[in-house]
From Swiss-Prot:
GO terms for molecular function: chlorophyll binding; electron transporter, transferring electrons within the cyclic electron transport pathway of photosynthesis activity; iron ion binding; oxidoreductase activity, acting on diphenols and related substances as donors, oxygen as acceptor; oxygen evolving activity. GO terms for cellular component: chloroplast thylakoid membrane; photosystem II. This is Photosystem II protein D1. It is a multi-pass membrane protein. The gene is psbA.
Length: 353
């Protein structure tokens, strides 16, 4: 009888834990995805802060030339970064216990792998947690779908691209200048500016900013005034009120006359779907573009594509970009390569005699 009572108490304790994890009454929803999200993001954040402040230089290229990235080793907020794991490690899983010592682990850039892998797990679980909370509240699942765009972008630069290039040393450094360096080198090696998927991403980000500004300014300009002239119009809104807070007909009429009638939405639901879908689809395409360029399916190459009747090349902007790419590539990892990859890949002329 005592055993049965203990089992019931144990089940009751587990049941209470499950109810607490999945309760929507908590100030912050945890959820089953949160059980994994919280420790992974805490780990990634803690190691990032410590490494950004105090990590020793990392031999990123695997040629015994360490690169400093932390504040205590001479960097500032702009130049500092978590240096990617060494090319000597490649794609190997490199936890602390795989190194002979902590000093070796730090020298080979172990913190980068630790941060990136925990971060990707954490943001994926955050996306799952968004879906989980929506499900519990009876909401539609599109918040998690929208968040999948930045998750896909992060996975592309931190995981897919290193896999395609064969080393975590090719991943994006975790810092401001390191991000810019990654962008410049990516352009030099893959001509991303001439890739249609990147163009769609630019349209998505800048278009999304434009549409967001247009929508916000239109709504703010067509608020239904509930206050006197001496009070802020914002004070006329009560959280949870049933009445519309702005006049969509007035906004529709204004914008329809500013451009033309059918350029303006007359359905609030389709308008907000468009505002969400435009940047999300654009960022999806950019992440897909990064993931294909990871395996060297690069941007368009229109170099020397225009010639005159004598066969002489007439330079276009494509040739100017190509010249810039070669310049950036020859300066990249200058001690690791004697020539840019494009030049080194040219077949050597045959020698007779």
């Amino acid at each position: 009888m005592t055993v049965i009572l203990e089992r019931r108490e144990s089940e009751s304790l587990w049941g209470r834990f499950c109810n607490w994890i999945t309760s929507t009454e908590n100030r912050l929803y945890i959820g089953w995805f949160g059980v994994l999200m919280i420790p992974t993001l805490l780990t990634a954040t803690s190691v990032f802060i410590i490494a950004f402040i105090a990590a020793p230089p990392v031999d990123i290229d695997g040629i015994r030339e360490p690169v400093s990235g932390s504040l205590l080793y001479g960097n500032n907020i702009i130049s500092g970064a978590i240096i990617p794991t060494s090319a000597a490690i490649g794609l190997h899983f490199y936890p602390i216990w795989e190194a002979a010592s902590v000093d070796e682990w730090l020298y080979n850039g172990g913190p980068y792998e630790l941060i990136v892998l925990h971060f990707l797990l954490g943001v994926a679980c955050y996306m799952g947690r968004e879906w989980e909370l929506s499900f519990r509240l009876g909401m539609r699942p599109w918040i998690a779908v929208a968040y999948s765009a930045p998750v896909a972008a992060a996975a592309a630069v931190f995981l897919i691209y290193p896999i395609g290039q064969g080393s975590f040393s090719d991943g994006m450094p975790l810092g401001i200048s390191g991000t810019f360096n990654f962008m410049i080198v990516f352009q030099a090696e893959h001509n991303i500016l001439m890739h249609p998927f990147h163009m769609l991403g630019v349209a998505g980000v800048f278009g999304g900013s434009l549409f967001s500004a247009m929508h916000g300014s239109l709504v703010t300009s067509s608020l239904i005034r509930e206050t006197t002239e001496n009070e802020s119009a914002n004070a006329g809104y009560r959280f949870g009120q049933e009445e519309e807070t702005y006049n969509i007909v007035a906004a529709h009429g204004y914008f329809g006359r500013l451009i033309f009638q059918y350029a303006s939405f007359n359905n609030s639901r389709s308008l907000h779907f468009f505002l969400a879908a435009w940047p999300v689809v654009g960022i999806w395409f950019t992440a897909l573009g990064i993931s294909t360029m990871a395996f060297n399916l690069n941007g368009f190459n229109f170099n020397q594509s225009v010639v005159d009747s004598q066969g002489r090349v007439i330079n276009t902007w494509a040739d100017i970009i190509n010249r810039a790419n070669l310049g950036m590539e020859v300066m990249h990892e200058r001690n690791a390569h004697n020539f840019p990859l494009d030049l080194a890949a040219v077949e050597a002329p045959s020698i007779n005699g």
